[in-house]
């Protein structure tokens, strides 16, 4: 086993890509959705498998794939798991594996990443603070042969069902179906917002009158000006035209066997167990 501590997002990408070119069988990403993104990008359309040991804040991809959040159990799942092929998404020139989005979620992601403090409490604190002063944006949406204008609170492009922390923005999203779920959260009365938000955690938000979901392979969004985006929890700025497409069967990922009993850490490979004791 080769252990490599990444020093930057580019180092993570370049290192995983190098390992794939050297035909390593598995590359293990230890981190949150952002770290997983950086490493998985280097494995696109290669035979090298991605494995995940989740130690991030939201761990949206790991939760969607039912990868244990305990690192010992996650390692056991790697040693005794199945391999599946998952899709990726592309928002202009950026790759994502979990979700990407515009509007309020991008604003919160930017504030959260700049705060230096992690955790669900910090995230929710920014949500409350920013909601008071946030104004919906106007978008032109082209999807499924339709073109229409929409005022929206946020727009999420979901490859998997949740943002992280079991907040399900699109509970029925399938990470291997060759499609993306485009979720348009429309203008919502302030009095209704707590109830709609709660539906994220009950996996019922897809039934809300304030959300429209479109399943597609590509979508084009035009907004009034450049602005923030988020992709797998990372922040960025893009122009007024946003093109989002699905990349089918982009990465091979090791996931737990559905029929496996509860995973026990006693089976952890000695090299990895020793590594975690450091």
Question: Where do the PLM segments sit?
Answer:
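A generic structural signal for short beta-strands and their flanking turns/coil linkers
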Residues: 135-137, 151-153, 176-181, 215-219
